[in-house]
């Protein structure tokens, strides 16, 4: 139950790379139904995100693996090296 509470608290947070550049806003969290583990974050990319353009993210919504998350506070920080246009 704690995982779901944390997931609800994370929704709507801004997502930044570990280089301090904004990617977008967290809109959903995908959880494995069997294990209950968080698998991916669904992020709505900001239209003016320079980081997204540099990485090659052209879709409006992208899946970012939860393993890329390095910190969560007022914002979510993800490791840019683990985010790719192939997600």
Which residues does each PLM region occupy?
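Peripheral interaction segments used for macromolecular assembly
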Residues: 1-87
């Amino acid at each position: 139950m704690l995982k779901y509470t944390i997931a609800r608290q994370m929704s709507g947070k801004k997502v930044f790379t570990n280089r301090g550049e904004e990617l977008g806003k967290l809109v959903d969290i995908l959880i494995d139904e069997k294990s209950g583990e968080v698998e991916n974050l669904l992020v709505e990319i900001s239209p003016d995100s320079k980081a997204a353009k540099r990485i090659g993210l052209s879709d409006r919504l992208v899946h970012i693996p939860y393993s890329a998350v390095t910190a969560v506070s007022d914002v979510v920080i993800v490791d840019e090296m683990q985010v790719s246009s192939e997600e």
